[in-house]
Amino acid sequence: ILQHHKFENEISQSLKKYNKKGLKIGIAGEHLMPFYLRDILTSSMPDVEFPIVTDILDDMRKIKSSKEIELMEKAAEINDSVLTELKKIIKVGMTEQQVVAHADFLGRQLGADLGSATVVMSGKNTKFPAWRASEKKLKKGELLMVDFNPTIGHYCNDGGLTFLLPGASKYKTNALINSHKILKETISSIKSQ
């Protein structure tokens, strides 16, 4: 039998030393914080104020230094390089897992860490909003979606590409071409505020 350790008491005891009048501890991402954790904080430190600072932090994150911009650009370059190289490597008969392995290896060769798991979906699996790559083999004429997220210096780029494997029908080919046109038109219409 596994015993699950209840850490609430230990956390509560550790937090009590911070219970001081006038102390403020900002909470960011309050919509993600479990209620039980909020309850531990407020009951352990009843004299502390817990202002919501999500908007303040979001505004601060909008301002980037030249170094941060450089890291973001580097992550984007790595993403582009990996997806470009994948186009040359991917073959009918490979598994989704093999595509993931190639993407992750290429990204790491270029010095990136992974911001999140690489998503590879092919054929019938492309109908899911997110997918854990499987041993499903890539088939002739299928769509293949790759979502790769390289991270450099804690800055992550999230980019994806939809491939059309050789042997696709005219319908799929036209659908992909038209989707790409719409995407380009949409991007060019976006204006900074």
Model-derived regions: residue spans:
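Active-site neighborhoods and metal-handling regions in enzymes and metal-associated proteins
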Residues: 1-193
